[in-house]
């Protein structure tokens, strides 16, 4: 098992470019199954989850060609449906959370898919109800195979209809959209997720010949078409990586410029960091973060403690709360971090407490952080990365800490961050992979 050894106290300086968005590209790659024609995708990140999904499509018979450093083409003109029925396919699906988004396109184009419960982060319950209920309303049939421990999902014909989702699930909405684009008639999805990832998926599908309206809202209308065609698509920069770099600069008192961030697609992320006292400046499509000795957390107008809580888009993404929690440990003031959407993502705070942070874990969803205002530096220590986002938060803490830290299970970080130690070391960090 690989690990990072981090020498804390190094300040960073220079420019850094965010990778392509992981949460977008997983959907986009699955959508290539909807056509037999060639689809070319630009700005594909070289990370474990994406590489594993690409390999899974290869094993399904999709022709995958790497055409450049971050450019791939996919042509699903000879999908091996026997392999999709095999135990080998189910085993791969069970290891990869992103494979859940194969259901919609496979059902929409081929009318059948077997599916094992997926893996991924251990961050609490992640229901598939929204996916399955939406697909059921389109006409899918579900059976559970006890022997294979897998769902058998079939559809003789998918028909569009109105549906009100019980939660604005990003992957659930994506699956329903991909199944509905070639269903007969009109599908209306209310309480649809509207993250930039979903907007990108819808725009790509429209370029392929789909008829989706209401993009960027929570009310989508999809007119089914007979077939989809090939296209080219460029993945957005990863907003989670952009936020991680902002937090990293603040914690290490560094001056960095984050290049080509697609600022208009960051939502309230920049403002949420500003509420923690972080100075940042938009320069065209870049973000400049100056060196900052102290930063002061805002209070609410009535003087009560600031609360940062996640919410469906355009609210604050849950994927950055771990980073914001770490940043708050060296701020002046206090903040309540409220992780509403997952119940186990705050369980890494004991590792920060061991490093000297002042954090009160109220319950599985809430933690109060009392900032040190840099009067006491965090101490280096040994820790393990429980999931992608906690892993990068621990890395940020270790980079700002006094002494040497060791983070194990860094495969979790590799799932979401491309060549992270190499890119940070080029800015002056002291990170060694062992």
For every predicted segment, state its role.
Residues 1-434:
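Short, structured segments at the rim of ligand-binding sites
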